[in-house]
Swiss-Prot record:
NCBIfam families: N2Fix_CO_CowN. The keyword Thylakoid does not apply. GO terms for biological process: nitrogen fixation. Is required to sustain N(2)-dependent growth in the presence of low levels of carbon monoxide (CO). Probably acts by protecting the N(2) fixation ability of the nitrogenase complex, which is inactivated in the presence of CO. InterPro entries: CowN. The keyword Ligase does not apply. Belongs to the CowN family. It comes from Azorhizobium caulinodans (strain ATCC 43989 / DSM 5975 / JCM 20966 / LMG 6465 / NBRC 14845 / NCIMB 13405 / ORS 571). It comes from the Bacteria. This is N(2)-fixation sustaining protein CowN. Disulfide bonds: none annotated.
Length: 122
């Protein structure tokens, strides 16, 4: 009898629950965000980064078509039923572009707030 080419399909337990190095960890990672997200100010972190961002993308000298599209998507995210999650996802998917913009403007405060948003919320 020939062995199945996909032996993981014949097991009763899902592939993700099988013994793996990640399943063998017994220590809790440092920082509460990996366990509960308790005490993290998601809204405040997002608001601070958006305030920095708006200074640049609303200014005709530093805004462009890319950021105009971002503003339209942000307005749609904020008006939807899942505004919190949609806004967080939108910021997450544009984090590198925001970082580039803040670096180009040499805005250290914006970069610090963006780093905090990345580390605590993404």
């Amino acid at each position: 009898m020939r062995a199945s080419p996909t032996p993981w399909l014949s097991r009763a337990e899902p592939y993700c629950q099988r013994e793996s190095p990640m399943n063998l960890l017994t220590t809790t990672p440092a920082g509460d965000r990996y366990v509960t997200f308790n005490g993290i100010d998601f809204e405040g972190n997002m608001a601070r980064v958006l305030a920095h961002l708006r200074r640049y993308i609303d200014d005709p000298r530093t805004g462009n078509a890319f950021w105009d599209r971002f503003k339209a998507r942000l307005a749609a995210a904020e008006s939807g039923g899942n505004a919190f999650q949609d806004k967080l996802l939108l910021l997450h998917s544009h984090v590198y572009y925001m970082g580039d913009l803040f670096e180009d403007q040499e805005d250290e405060a914006a970069l610090a707030d963006l780093r905090k948003l990345e580390e605590e919320c993404f």
